[in-house]
Amino acid sequence: MGKFEDKKQLRCSFCGKNQEQVKRLIAGPGVYICDECIELCSEIIEDEFEGNTESSPLEASNLPKPQEIKDYLDQYVVGQDRAKKSLAVAVYNHYKRINANKAEDDVELQKSNILLLGPTGSGKTLLAQTLAKMLNVPFAIADATTLTEAGYVGEDVENILLKLIQNADYDVERAEKGIIYIDEIDKIARKSENPSITRDVSGEGVQQALLKILEGTTASVPPQGGRKHPHQEFIQINTSNILFICGGAFDGIDKIIEKRGTKSSIGFGAEVKGKSEKNVGELLKDIMPGDLLKFGLIPEFVGRLPVLVTLEALDNEALVSILTKPKNALVKQYKKLFELDNVKLDFTEEALKAIADEAINRKTGARGLRAIVEETMMDIMFDIPSEENIVKATITEETIKDRKDPELEKLPEGEVRPTLKTEKKNKARKDIETA
């Protein structure tokens, strides 16, 4: 009888204890769990959650210092030291402010959004992307040219926030500490320095619409994007701790700065001043908020972007460094592509300089480098998979400038290069034999 009762006794499916050995046994479909196992699971989940919270780079103890931020940017972005220092300090202060405002204090620190000014292809977007990657925070890129004032055809400014929420997997709390990069911000400048009489829905109107979210407000975001309508549900997001980085080329602002710097005088004794010998990069260093107003940004908008960071146009030396030095440099990427076919790829120093010169001539900066290399490599990348005796390709200056074929190193006729997989097997076999 006792044996029969023992068989019928209920046990925890995880630890094996019977119902008499535990306080409570909870039944599920064909499974049982005791209160002790539930408590243990709860502790494990809590420890993991605390571990993730502690490792957050935004906590005061883990927040990277400006020097550490700059060192990280140096790995991916060539040159622009002044811009990297300014960005590192601004980002450090922003997240330090978030941690400080959590505490009960009389002094509330205000947000300092950032305005990046620099020519096309100088690294504005890459700097913002790299910062977000380092800090492990949600990041979204928006194009200011697609935005219009509410009620007109185009995107509402709230759609920018939706991109950030989506990139945070709809975790609103995490999105509220993210970074938003608004590109082409110079394209929403009003058409003249004076206030417009007619409605400027894609210029001044967008600036007005952006004011609140830049400063910090609780915005209502449609979960599916598009226009708002009264009967839909909204996601509420507070933008007070979102860092906004706006970037633009601001073509022509150098003339405004130059004009401000050269005061002309009238009369026979007047000093005749020639055109400034400074280049665009040097002139941008002298930028003042008043220059942005003359360019067409409204005073309230300029006031919400207090940190002005200028980037210089990239010269030949900087572009060659961009091709070769960063962790994910373009030359390294193409060498890896060829390596997958077991072919060695080399670029001569003259070829790299020729690629950089072409990018400068096209006025595309670093952004145009990939297009130039892709044009050059198209034929050889087409031929290599079929011509199995090629083991090395060297890109020369003539390949870039005159579109001549690369210098190829081939195996004797009839021989075929081994595949990467075969070569690895042969190497492993040789290592075993010599061991």
From Swiss-Prot:
Organism for this UniProt entry: Clostridium perfringens (strain 13 / Type A)
Subunit organization: Component of the ClpX-ClpP complex. Forms a hexameric ring that, in the presence of ATP, binds to fourteen ClpP subunits assembled into a disk-like structure with a central cavity, resembling the structure of eukaryotic proteasomes.
Positions that bind ATP: 119-126
Matches recorded under SMART domains: AAA, ClpB_D2-small, zf-C4_ClpX
GO molecular function: ATP binding; ATP hydrolysis activity; ATP-dependent protein folding chaperone; protein dimerization activity; unfolded protein binding; zinc ion binding
Record-linked HAMAP family: ClpX (MF_00175)
Spans annotated as Disordered: 401-435
Residues the entry annotates as binding Zn(2+): 12, 15, 34, 37
Record's keyword annotation contains Metal-binding: yes
Name assigned to this protein: ATP-dependent Clp protease ATP-binding subunit ClpX
GO BP term (any one): proteolysis involved in protein catabolic process
CDD domains: RecA-like_ClpX
Protein keywords: ATP-binding, Chaperone, Metal-binding, Nucleotide-binding, Zinc
Gene from which the chain derives: clpX
GO CC, any one term: HslUV protease complex
Keyword tRNA processing assigned: no
Function: ATP-dependent specificity component of the Clp protease. It directs the protease to specific substrates. Can perform chaperone functions in the absence of ClpP.
Xref: InterPro entries: AAA+_ATPase, ATP-dep_Clp_protease_ClpX, ATPase_AAA_core, Clp_ATPase_C, Clp_protease_ATP-bd_su_ClpX, ClpX_bact, P-loop_NTPase, Znf_CppX_C4
Protein family per UniProt: Belongs to the ClpX chaperone family.
Every ClpX-type ZB domain range: 1-53
